Amino acid sequence: SRGLGDVYKRQHGTSVMFKPDAEIFEETTVFDYEVLLKRMREQAFLNAGLTIELSDQRDPANPQGEKMCYEGGIRQFIEHIHKTRGLESLSEQVIYFTGSKGDNAVEIAMQYNDSYNELILSFANNVHTIDGGMHELGFRNALTKTLNEYGKRFGLLKDDSKLMGEDVREGLTAIISVKLTDCQFESQTKVKLGNPEIKPFVESIVSEKLMNYLEENPAVARAIFDKSLAAQ
């Protein structure tokens, strides 16, 4: 590698130009603007404050482009999802917390809405893990466990009653983003995270931070429980 040479003061960063090779890009060599826009917007949400500009000049008569920067990061991601899907949120603010241990870090945003569906999007080093993995499993386990503990502690659940995972996830939109130094994906397509140490790490952070939030926001906690109990 020759490294990067000096640049003029008005220049910055690295430019990469390429022409898609049909032997490598087997499905298509024509890029879909909407697919690229969705991916770029996703990255802008995952990296709060990062500005990403997409410009499509292939058709001079009809150029397309968009500049994206979200200071609220994945909190705005949740708001964007609810707005575009026409969903009514159960609380004004998105539940948001972070945590780290050693070289591992997790960032979570979640909010309940008036639908009956769950939407959990998980990412590892900005890669969308479509099939989930250890980070998502840790979140799901902690969510169910924490809500049951809170419910029994504050009398929202009877001693013999219990909320199931599908009950507490009904109407939930959540974004889970973990940053690791060594991602272990279970396939070449990187759709599932396999790092075993991430499950207890995420589970511990969610259990602590979510319990603190519920205790500090009893009205939101009550709304979540009303919805979860109705789902039984």
Per-region residue spans from a language model:
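GHKL-family ATPase ATP-binding module
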Residues: 1-232
